Structure formats: structure tokens, C-alpha cells
Amino acid sequence: ERSLPKAAVCFTTPAMTRRAAEWLSRLGGCRPLAILSDDFDDIVWQSEAENADLLLLGVSFSEGAEEPRDITARCDVAVEVRKRRPECRVYLACEAGHPERLPALEKAVELGLIDGYFIGELTARQARLWLAETQRQRRMRS
């Protein structure tokens, strides 16, 4: 159990975050951690305090949201988390239906701000790939 990577999860609502953490728990291959506060500083602090190996951030493009959790905002979180935990891999789970966002996502990966992204309902296959990449990186460090 201790050898499994710690996967921190933060989506736009606590309920979505809990569901994602429970889903990862059922999927296996990691020790999931729900970050229930979507506040920038809270995400950064908790990722560092919990020694997260992987951070999965939900991205919302909804116009009605009080504070849209867009790609730029999430990349800002990723950069700050990486300053404190350079070994933490950061992935974005984006809502579907916004093909115009693809260039920004590609650029974020190209610039090394994030390690990857998924659009739509995150699949078990994709989550396992990310966990495997994280585990491989952890082994190379130790």
C-alpha cells in the first residue's frame, strides 16, 4: 500500500471531488486523496503537505461559474504545486464540448505546465496510464 502513488484530486465541487476520489479508490493502483477546497492556496498547500505524486484537477468552462476553473487557472495551480513538489505529475480532466480549448491544452503540455489532459468522462484506461507513468517516475527517483 505504501508503495502506491498518492493521487490528489480536486474538482469544481466537493461532491465531484469525492466521487472522483472514490472512483480512483475502486480503480486501485493509488492512494487517493480528496482536496475538497477548490481554493488555489488550499490545493497547493494540501498537495505539498500530503506529498502528492499525482494531482488531477477538474477543469470547468461553464460561464455561469462564480470563478471559472479554466485551463489558465489550473495551469497556475500546476506551476505552483511543481515549485514545491517538482516530482508531482499534474493532469487536467476537462469537460467535453469545447473543441476550441484543444490548442490551449496542447500548448500547456508542450510548455511542460501539465503532464497531460483528458476531455470528457475520464476513462479507467486513461487513469491507469497516468498512474503507471507516475509509478514509473517514482521508481526512477528512488
Show which residues each predicted segment covers:
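Structural motif
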Residues: 9-15, 37-38, 58-61, 93-96, ...
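Short, aromatic/basic amphipathic alpha-helical patches
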Residues: 19-26, 77, 102-111
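Two-component/phosphorelay signaling modules centered on CheY-like receiver
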Residues: 9-40
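Two-component signal transduction core modules
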Residues: 55, 90, 116-117
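A short, charged/proline- and glycine-enriched loop
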Residues: 2-7
